[in-house]
């Protein structure tokens, strides 16, 4: 059975489409989001609400303690167990999310960076980043993998550390690692549907509205509750978009509106990076929203794509 995947940048309606397809196909949703895995962070990560789920079971949401360094390798293993369980019950898995790296790791099934499931290499590299600084780590990447370094910004901590992680565990550059893993048959066959806005201004408005709704739903209270629970400020989860800015506001380092504006800006920048990543994948079938979302058109497009691949 092919997995149905709904991908796209933040704020483009993936949750809605994933639920609609799961209802139509008799399926269950598996979240593919690097931040929704954490407990107690439902508002800032835009985890689906009970109302949005419409009774459809959702997996890989709120499964990890935010103190943990939850790696992509661990996600791939945990999500695969969910997928296999859904398949064993004769149900259709619907993968929903915008984290392209996590999606690729789940579908490929041949590990990530050699399978650093315990996060040992990543934890060591994170510690070195804190002690030595980003410039030193970036210089190290330039020495061992100049090709990858040439495509990254000095401040792109996540991808710099990922490239170093791959090298130190496998002895290979990212290009070499990717070339080798592409030769291995994927764990799952899939049909991929992408959602995005045709006009950039429409995407901007959708993201801004999404952030406003998060704040209205209690984002700042959620962050305060995490702090009150004893969650350290420097854990990876608290550096996510929305949480870092909320911390600045709660600490008196930024005005409330300044924090909200910064969340909107970073969210738009993140959406742009998501699109750049996902558009590299020629297997994704894209549906572009006009200024007004016409839901039946999107559902008809998606249904036609699925029927083309024998999914019904």
For every predicted segment, state its role:
Residues 1-312:
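Phosphate/pyrophosphate-binding catalytic cores of soluble transferases and nucleic-acid-acting enzymes
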């Amino acid at each position: 059975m092919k997995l149905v995947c709904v991908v796209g940048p933040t704020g483009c309606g993936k949750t809605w489409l994933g639920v609609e397809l799961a209802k139509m196909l008799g399926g269950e949703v598996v979240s593919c989001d690097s931040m929704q895995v954490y407990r107690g962070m439902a508002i800032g990560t835009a985890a689906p609400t009970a109302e949005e789920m419409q009774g459809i079971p959702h997996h890989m949401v709120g499964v990890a303690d935010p103190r943990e360094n939850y790696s992509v390798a661990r996600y791939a293993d945990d999500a695969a167990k969910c997928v296999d369980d859904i398949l064993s019950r004769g149900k259709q898995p619907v993968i929903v999310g915008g984290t392209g790296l996590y999606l690729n790791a789940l579908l490929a099934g041949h590990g990530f960076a050699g399978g650093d499931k315990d996060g040992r290499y990543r934890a060591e590299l994170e510690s070195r980043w804190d002690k030595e600084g980003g410039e030193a780590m970036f210089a190290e990447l330039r020495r061992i993998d100049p090709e990858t370094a040439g495509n990254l910004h000095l401040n792109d901590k996540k991808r710099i550390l990922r490239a170093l992680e791959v090298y130190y565990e496998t002895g290979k550059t990212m290009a070499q690692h990717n070339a080798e893993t592409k030769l291995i048959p994927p764990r799952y066959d899939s049909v991929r549907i992408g959602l995005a806005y045709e006009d950039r201004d429409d995407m901007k408005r959708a993201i801004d509205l999404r952030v406003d709704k998060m704040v209205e739903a209690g984002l700042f209270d959620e962050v305060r509750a995490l702090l009150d629970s004893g969650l350290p400020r420097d854990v990876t989860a608290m550096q996510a978009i929305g949480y870092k800015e909320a911390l600045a506001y709660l600490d008196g380092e930024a005005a409330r509106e300044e924090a909200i504006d910064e969340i909107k800006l970073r969210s738009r920048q993140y959406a742009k990076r998501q699109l750049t990543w996902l558009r590299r994948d020629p297997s994704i079938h894209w549906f572009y929203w006009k200024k007004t979302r016409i839901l039946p058109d999107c559902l008809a497009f998606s249904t036609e794509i699925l029927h083309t691949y024998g999914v019904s």
